[in-house]
């Protein structure tokens, strides 16, 4: 049985977002922390924090919504895992994808760390496409 911790993280965020949860808890790892940092910096989540539990730790991701209580609107409209264990997707610096014509982001792991598509283009590096968020 294969397990994909990044796909699990994205699914937890997607499911909590669909039912307007305030936050969701995710088993922590360094890669997941970096992905959360990008999501926060790009304005897709309100915040996240690391909670020590004596094991690997937990990331509590606080989701972000627009509008008031009655007419709330999701900030994350879609979040999709691109490269997975059965099919790795690598791109070079000239073929970094644009998500929704620049309205979304692609998250990449590169030799310079975890970056958005825009940052990777500026640094001139390619890498593995982890996810699309819009």
Curated annotation (Swiss-Prot):
Protein name from the UniProt record: Small ribosomal subunit protein uS8
Keywords annotated in UniProt: Ribonucleoprotein, Ribosomal protein, RNA-binding, rRNA-binding
Record-linked InterPro entries: Ribosomal_uS8, Ribosomal_uS8_CS, Ribosomal_uS8_sf
GO terms for cellular component: cytosolic small ribosomal subunit
Pfam family, one: Ribosomal_S8
PROSITE patterns per the UniProt record, alphabetical: RIBOSOMAL_S8
Disulfide bonds: none
SUPFAM superfamilies reported for this sequence: Ribosomal protein S8
Assembly and interaction partners: Part of the 30S ribosomal subunit. Contacts proteins S5 and S12.
Family recorded in the similarity comment: Belongs to the universal ribosomal protein uS8 family.
Single GO MF annotation: rRNA binding
Superkingdom in the source lineage: Bacteria
GO annotation, biological process: translation
Function statement: One of the primary rRNA binding proteins, it binds directly to 16S rRNA central domain where it helps coordinate assembly of the platform of the 30S subunit.
